[in-house]
Structures are given as C-alpha cells and as structure tokens.
Amino acid sequence: MITPKNNKIIHWFFHRYILRLIDKNFRSFNYNNIAVDADKSVLLIPNHFSWWDGFILYYLNYKLFKKRFHIMILEETVSKVFFLKYMGAFSISKNSKGLIESLNYAAELLNDPQNLVVIFPQGKLYSNFVQQVDFDKGILRVIDKTQQKTQLIFSATFIEYFEHKKPGVNVYVNKSAVNSFNNIHQLTEAYQQHYEAARQQQTQIVI
C-alpha cells in the first residue's frame, strides 16, 4: 500500500496548483454550509463521476471543512501520478489483503480529529446524473471502527454548463443522522436519500 508522504515544498506547490486548476476550469464553485465538529474527524462519502472528483473535494475541504485532506485512490493511479501521495492520497488494491490494509489505514487516519478522509464506495465511475447509487460493502469496515470518533458526511457533486463556456460546480453536503449501519443496504439507502434530494434540487435550476 502507498501511504501519504510529507514534503512541505511539494505540498505547497501542488496545493496552489489544485486551487488554480479549479478556479481556471470552472466558472463557479458552490456548496452549502454545514456545521462541522472540530473535535471529530470527517469521513466524506461522495458520488464518483469524473477525473475531477478528487480535486473538487480537495477544494471543498479547503473552503469548508479545513481538515487535513486524505483520499483513497486506486493503487495504479497513485503510482502513475507522483504528486498525489504528497496531497494526502493513499492507495487501495483490489486484492483482498490490500483492500483490508487500506480500509484499516483509513480507520486509523480517522482516529485523529484533524483528519478528513474521502472514500468512493461506488468503486467505479458512473454518470453524473445516475438515478440509483450502489456501494461496495468495504466502507462499513471503516465506519464500524470509527463511529464514535468521526462525523459521516455525504456529498453529491453536479457539474453543468447551461449557457456558459465553462461549467459550474455545485456540491451538496449533509451530515448523516447516524454513524452506525447494520449492513451496506442501510448505508446505501441513507446516501441515496441525500443524493436524490440533491439531484432534484440541481435539476430544478433554470436559467
């Protein structure tokens, strides 16, 4: 497993790079404010639809959560893009041993209230406006190990152009009412309710 590395110079450079990348490529970046407990870490569960996802959530953390950013990414991606590990990325492998190691590492990170961890339970890329969201069950291992120490936050991101040359980003976030789920179906349903409400709100935008 590839874990995050510390290098202040590299981190500073690519922090500025990511912020500029978002500002340059999107005409707007909108999100709703929610109360965040400073004494608890954040487990952020988003939808997964594009190459931009990690950068968008990094930007969201910078603007809203203000925690130390970490994100679980496929091992081949972390290996290929050298700077990701300096920006909080850690790898996950699809083999069972590597999978458990990465999930346990995510749980360890969440023991620190200053940390935020992003996990994409969908596991694959889907359409930005897919109706039904399905999760892999591995995320439950992280939640079960950290439910008293972290706050579970759902996010749903939508990108649209309307009449503009550049698209706008809308991120809808909501804190889960509970941090314990008996099975993956309960977690998926809880996220689905947030996602559907966000999708309906997004599709009601008329220019």
Please place each PLM-identified region on the residue numbering.
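Short, flexible loop segments at the rims of nucleotide/cofactor-binding pockets, characterized by
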Residues: 18-25, 93-98, 129-131
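Non-catalytic C-terminal accessory region of glycerolipid acyltransferases
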Residues: 2, 103-207
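Catalytic core of membrane glycerolipid acyltransferases/transacylases, capturing the structured
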Residues: 40-96
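Flexible, charged surface loops at secondary-structure boundaries
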Residues: 34-39, 65-66, 110-113
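Alpha-helical membrane-targeting segments
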Residues: 1-26, 79-87
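Glycine-rich, highly charged phosphate/nucleotide-binding loops
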Residues: 25-30, 97-105
